[in-house]
UniProtKB/Swiss-Prot annotation:
Protein known as: Putative thymidine phosphorylase
SMART domains, alphabetized: PYNP_C
Catalytic class of the enzyme: transferase
Annotated catalysed reactions: thymidine + phosphate = 2-deoxy-alpha-D-ribose 1-phosphate + thymine
GO cellular component: cytosol
InterPro entries on file: Glycosyl_Trfase_fam3, Glycosyl_Trfase_fam3_N_dom, Glycosyl_Trfase_fam3_N_dom_sf, Nuc_phospho_transferase, PYNP-like_C_sf, PYNP_C, Pyrmidine_PPase_CS, Thym_Pase_Put
Organism: Sphingopyxis alaskensis (strain DSM 13593 / LMG 18877 / RB2256) (Sphingomonas alaskensis)
GO molecular function per UniProt: 1,4-alpha-oligoglucan phosphorylase activity; thymidine phosphorylase activity
Source superkingdom: Bacteria
Annotated keywords: Glycosyltransferase, Transferase
Amino acid sequence: MTHPVPDTGPASENMAPHRLRARPLGLFLPQQQPAVVMRTDCYICRSEGLAARSQVLIQAGGREILASLLHSSGEMIAPGEIGLSESAAAALGVAPGDAVSVRHAPPIDSFGALRGRVYGNRLDGAAFRSIVDDIVAGRYSDVHLSAFVTACSAFPLDHAETVALTGAMVASGERLAWGSDVVVDKHSVGGLPGNRTTPIVVAIVAALGLIMPKTSSRAITSPAGTADTMETLAPVNLDVGAIRRVVDHEGGCIVWGGAVSLSPADDIIIGVERVLDLDAAGQLVASVLSKKLAAGATHLVVDMPIGPTAKVRSPADAAALSGALQKVAAEFGLILKVMQGDGREPIGRGIGPALEARDILAVLEGRDPPPDLARRACELAGALIELAGRASPGTGAALAAQVLADGSAWSKFQRICEAQGGMRTPPLSNHRHVMTAQRPGRVSAIDNRRLAKLAKLAGAPAAKSAGLEMHVRLGSAVETGTPLLTVHAESQGELAYALAYAEAVGPILELSDR
């Protein structure tokens, strides 16, 4: 039901002060940030001094949100109307024509502490809780968020601050409990294409009776996140009740973390970090550990690939990050082990949701599996098994390989998929192009970042079947015409776009003389 509001100004006897008619615009902003659009000649903007990019309080039907204000001087918005972004309209639950009230947003109490941090002051737990609460409540605009991320990067968080931020992020959302002294989890630091070990690890450890409720992310800058890949095999958008049912029946799940409110501030902060290309160690540690603690983990293995084009580029960087993770985890009673690995090249053959899913199936079914993916999955699963006390030190990987070989992991994975809503077959691409060696030689270097960009230009992860299929590895000997990789796309245009990039960017795989 709509509530019409006249187009006239404040003198109209039928119009309550500061009320306008809602007009949903279908406008999407980064991080689903709520925004409203008002005319530059709107009497409310003039009387209240509402400038563009101001934070405003919007109320309708008992609901309220904070939103960023945009101005329009054209005919997009009629007199007496207010345009609403998609997230703003959804949060308010309004239909076209519904009455909406507008006023100045209240002051942000936590911003004083943040200003102090910009000038080098350390923050305590209360300050971080106040900041994180304001972030989750939507009181921080993208400008405020950028200031927070920059302040914590230019002047890095110390140990006490990292602990405080981690605790504040955990407290900002739901926290799951599983009624068990041992709940295992795994995290990959990232930066390596493919490397889709998580579904295999979950299947192995759940087959051994361990509890592993895995909440995973979608891709932000990569060709696929675990949730994107898993979605080609089974539904992943499960609420907390559904997650509990799956885990109660099967001991594990692989679901999208965005469907549940675990450390919600983390998702918001990560989005800003990506735009600013900032990835400070303290915030990374708080991000990883807050999600795992909120998910109820007691034992965690961190996969940390090291390589010149991976996220962690040197042994020194790996040692520093590993130490920080260990120290902060200990403050929360989380038992953690870091597994460093070779990050010089992709793991597995596929890069992109469906292609990575096919690698997972090949490993679980024992059907021509990529050896490196099977090996790394068993190493990580073995570390979790040992950490949980189910195997003596040095024997976990062999036990994981046995569970993989005898079909127990494959059977468990199928049951998890069915419990999540039914198993699916990953789609096949419509268009493919094989890139071949232009001369004889040996593969001496692989640029992970360029591979990831090539896969994204081909359409991944939005196009589930798009991406790359690797045919060679570091050290492979090739002749002229030897297939190096196949580009997969769902449309001819996306394929052409990806190939144009590959031709322009220079070598993605470098060949040396034999």
